[in-house]
Swiss-Prot record:
Protein name per the record: Probable endonuclease 4
Enzyme kind, highest EC tier: hydrolase
Similarity section: Belongs to the AP endonuclease 2 family.
Positions of Zn(2+) 1 binding: H67, H107, E144
Pfam family, one: AP_endonuc_2
Species this chain originates from: Chloroflexus aggregans (strain MD-66 / DSM 9485)
One BP term from GO: base-excision repair
Catalytic activity line of the entry: Endonucleolytic cleavage to 5'-phosphooligonucleotide end-products
One GO MF term: zinc ion binding
Cofactor binding description: Binds 3 Zn(2+) ions.
Signal peptide region: none
Length: 286
């Protein structure tokens, strides 16, 4: 069975996320390693690192995945913004290493007018520079599929394939597939035929072995809308059948599958979405 999880708040410190995750029954978890809307943050203290490890051991929640700051744009044509983004991304990687977090999810960025190829080259150069320096230890960078809003990169599987061509450090590079994003980008997964075709295309261009994580989100907007609006599982334009296919796909049977669906402070919606996903899993004899 996949390891189902959700994105949890780090209010009060990164270690506090585990109690929240435990309260909604998470197997896996995604967090921000710092305030996602600020460029800088104070270092993680030794005490907080120890508390994080202790809470992870206590709860058994794993893996923990970090999503980087929304401010970071490694494709930015403006050198000052790009350099600021590279410094911030390096800090994200180092925080992951300090917390022994295996995966850092990032959107490939937005080219803001210089063109997709030029943007991809800038992203690849930035990531290659950091990985060449060994920043982040063994933490793997997961390139997330995007919906393709504006000039965002990563909405075509070809973009991911190009980044793997340009970045030589494949042991530190993987993929996170967001169901809402690929659907909004034009990849249909609503029935067995379209599901198989979409993942065959991803396998051909990138390789399914490079997929390390899923974001499970339904979509408020229709196929090919290029608009990123998450919906509760089964309540959007994708529908339940796609998620039934995904959670029972043996190729992804042990991967973390993280929901990023709308929720309030009591996280009741997380419990609802996770219960639905688990109910879709067919139990087979070992």
């Amino acid at each position: 069975m996949p390891r189902f999880g959700a994105h949890m708040s780090i209010s009060g410190g990164v270690s506090k996320s585990f109690a929240r995750g435990e309260s909604v029954g998470l197997d896996a978890m995604q967090i921000f390693a710092k305030n996602e809307r600020q460029w800088t943050a104070k270092p993680i203290s030794a005490e907080e690192m120890a508390a994080f490890q202790a809470e992870q051991q206590r709860t058994g929640i794993h893996p923990v995945i970090v999503h980087d700051s929304y401010l970071i744009n490694l494709a930015a044509p403006a050198d000052d913004l790009r350099e600021k983004s590279i410094v911030a991304f390096a800090d994200e990687l180092e925080r992951c290493a300090q917390l022994k977090i295996p995966y850092l999810v990032t959107h490939p960025g937005a080219h803001t007018g210089i063109g997709e190829e030029a943007g991809l080259v800038r992203v690849a150069d930035a990531i290659s520079r950091l990985l060449a320096e060994g920043v982040g230890g063994t933490t793997m960078i997961l390139l997330e599929t995007t919906a393709g809003q504006g000039t965002a990169l990563g909405y075509r599987f070809e973009h991911l394939a190009r980044l793997f061509e340009l970045i030589p450090y494949h042991d530190r590079l993987g993929v996170c597939v967001d169901t809402c994003h690929i659907f909004a980008a034009g990849y249909d997964i609503r029935d067995p035929d379209t599901y198989d075709a979409t993942f065959a295309e991803l396998d051909r261009l990138v390789g399914l072995e490079r997929v390390k994580c899923f974001h499970l989100n339904d979509s408020q907007k229709d196929l090919g809308s290029r608009v990123d609006r998450h919906a509760h599982i089964g309540q959007g334009c994708i529908g339940t059948e796609a998620f039934r296919l995904l959670v029972n796909d043996p190729r992804f049977a042990h991967l973390p599958m993280i929901i990023e669906t709308p929720k309030g402070e009591d996280m009741a919606e997380d419990r609802m979405n996770l219960a639905l996903l688990r109910s879709l899993v067919r139990i087979t004899a070992a």
